[in-house]
């Protein structure tokens, strides 16, 4: 199936008089494997279910959201690939004018708190519906327990309490949504399906109890305790179920879905995707996001970097789920054979490109360690890093007919390259020689060790060593390529002096004037956001300076980008 239906006429052409599942998304309908709603929808179709999709429905009117009719089984609501509040506002709470996932690029289609809006629209325009409303995607996933909301500067209830929904599917949703669809179809109990949350009047036996919502409101230390327990119970092997009381009911979080095998990953990414905007939405204008992802290929999911400001470990998991080389090669061959393909693959990667195929054997058997991280403060000895598999893959991809260039645009952990004594240099040389164009983007995020420690990242000595190796190999290859650096201003603990020191180090040691500086955004369910709200280091309980004035946050950024050079 090239496209999921979004009109009655398309349903008729498929011979359907109704659908089983109605997907509703805050993004326009891009039919690619980078669209979570589409992945889930096509996975359900692969298993015999009829699925339709409504993208960016008009709010306050029934015409859009009801045009495919009521589904037989459930509604599946997502705010989109990006949290709707992050999509709509900058780190200093200014309204964004552009949206790369909206036709025409104007940010006028995605409502604030899209999951809540769409769920309420279903209750309003499908009056008396008995079909389940399931919320999913990153916006729901990261708000599944009591969470800090930056945009209102307060703790909010688990999103199920506000959304008027029945079920929350968290993390990677293909398997849990398929199991739910089968259970509802067969009239079976769904409340033990992994990867789901729901509300109950009673606690669930043998599940861990988090501090209640009211206890979190009363004492920030309770909120820290709740988050620690929540974070430690995200591993598919070791996690226990969780309960959290809110008012007179409980949020029940079942343990996470199992990590996907290579076979399942291959099946998911072997499904047919149009790699285009659905014609119904295409006529509304160009979609900028397509330029980046149309010819990009996912190699794996998950990340064990566990940077404190990042939610990938909570959403995709700390265990790497990789596709086989043959599956990736086959996808690139298919792309290379399409009529309008220009010869360049925009990206081959995942959350962290060079974690493909690299996982700790102990973790795969026993689950993630509860008392240490894989890469911080130093790489664990149990994690054997060898980039040979990735070099082999890249060489295979380069040989495919009609391929001019395979780019790696996903992030790369340069500390892992340095830790790989066997193939790290070979991998870096391969990247520099054939897989970047003019510059390589890396994300040290800061240069001051105190701030890097709060971020959960390596010290700057690692950055310096990598920089030297990068330019050494460039010189050997006769290339004039550069490193560019992603940096963060106003992270909890960071003061003006830290940004001045960063600026000095960047100028004197890195020999750059940084431009890629973003202000820290406290998104739900990260340790850095926990620091921002509590003004404490949650690992030491020590008090932290946290810059909360938006003007002063901007000043921290400007110190590095020199926009206030002539100001007092």
Swiss-Prot record:
Q: Where is the Radical SAM core domain?
A: 289-562
Q: Which GO terms describe its molecular function?
A: 4 iron, 4 sulfur cluster binding; catalytic activity; iron ion binding
This protein is called UPF0313 protein FN0734
**Cofactor(s) it depends on:** [4Fe-4S] cluster
Q: Which organism is it from?
A: Fusobacterium nucleatum subsp. nucleatum (strain ATCC 25586 / DSM 15643 / BCRC 10681 / CIP 101130 / JCM 8532 / KCTC 2640 / LMG 13131 / VPI 4355)
Q: Which residues bind [4Fe-4S] cluster?
A: 303, 307, 310
One Pfam annotation reads: Radical_SAM_N
Is Nucleotide-binding given among the entry's keywords? no
Region annotation Disordered: where it falls in the sequence: 546-568
Q: How is the cofactor bound?
A: Binds 1 [4Fe-4S] cluster. The cluster is coordinated with 3 cysteines and an exchangeable S-adenosyl-L-methionine.
User: Is the keyword 4Fe-4S assigned to this protein?
Assistant: yes
Q: Which UniProt keywords apply?
A: 4Fe-4S, Iron, Iron-sulfur, Metal-binding, S-adenosyl-L-methionine
Family assignment from sequence similarity: Belongs to the UPF0313 family.
SUPFAM superfamilies for this protein: Radical SAM enzymes
